[in-house]
Amino acid sequence: MSTLTPGRPYAPGRQGFSSLRAGGLNWDAFPLRLFTKGNAKFWNPTDLDFSRDAEDWEGLNSEQQRNSTYLVAQFIAGEEAVTEDIQPFMKAMAAEGRFGDEMYLTQFCFEEAKHTQVFRLWMDAVGLTRDLHPFVAENPYYRQLFYEELPGSLKVLETDPSPVNQVRASVTYNHVIEGSLALTGYYAWQKVCTTRGILPGMQELVRRIGDDERRHMAWGTFTCRRHVAADDSNWGVVQERMAELMPLALGMIDWVNKQFEVQPYGLDDQEFIAYAADRAQRRLGAIESARGRPVEEIDLDYSPEALEEKFGEEDAKAMSEAAG
């Protein structure tokens, strides 16, 4: 019979428990602040009513429905992809001994799964039940981003969770996929629905998702900031990865636009490109501001959260104006 010796590590090598250490968990640390905030803002996809959306969908013309299907297919496939691909980041945080980040990323992953659920419920409600793979798989830029770059940049963390790889993964996942693509797409779609007074269920689900995603963005900015503060060369990694991926993001949007001779909703693409560029530059500015800062200060610096809250206020104001 084996004898258990207190204090000796056992497979798989756990040394102890963060929750049992003297002083417990630091609830003021940035990741746990986001975790607490997310718990307070819980919402249930099955509580949303999509009955009016089904009626409004039937009132759209065929090109508007086709354009909307491109958007929704990209949204839901993206939410499914990020649900799967965030998981190696949890292991990276475990390897770094950052249990607070692990806690937040479990909530983060759950929320991405919930976003997949709510889009699928909406699609079922309006009758989008056929195979929609062509709406994403035929877009070469979408394929490169979501089939290759996103999973590839996250999967490497399973074997090499170095700061450089964490920064590359965060820029890919948070700043390009979530920030430049998803949140900009949600803003554009929300503006279409609000201006036309249609699809109230979609408007509500996008509002809920956007609130979650801004917390995700805050964590991504925070993660890049702490690595930039620790090693200034990581700022170059941020810039390099953004430069690699932004042409793909713009190409993905342009490819969809070229599937239509006339824009079905009459959107001004330049407005949303400017929106995405403005948000990207302000987030990059938040990361750059960590250069030369003591690393220990970053955990208690809530400026990434404040920035995302500011973005939320700006979006709400824009939607109020769009509604008239």
From Swiss-Prot:
Protein name: R2-like ligand binding oxidase
A GO term, aspect molecular function: metal ion binding
SS bonds (residue pairs): none
Subunit field text: Homodimer.
Family per similarity comment: Belongs to the ribonucleoside diphosphate reductase small chain family. R2-like ligand binding oxidase subfamily.
Superkingdom of source: Bacteria
Lineage of the organism: Bacteria, Bacillati, Actinomycetota, Actinomycetes, Mycobacteriales
Cofactor note: Binds 1 Fe cation per subunit.
Described function: Probable oxidase.
Keyword Oxidoreductase: yes
InterPro entries the UniProt entry points to: Ferritin-like_SF, R2LOX, RNR-like, RNR_small_fam
Keyword hit for Ribosomal protein: no
Enzyme Commission no: 1.-.-.-
Cofactor(s) annotated in UniProt: Fe cation; Mn(2+)
Positions with a binding annotation for Mn(2+): 79, 112, 115
Annotated region (Disordered), positions in chain: 304-324
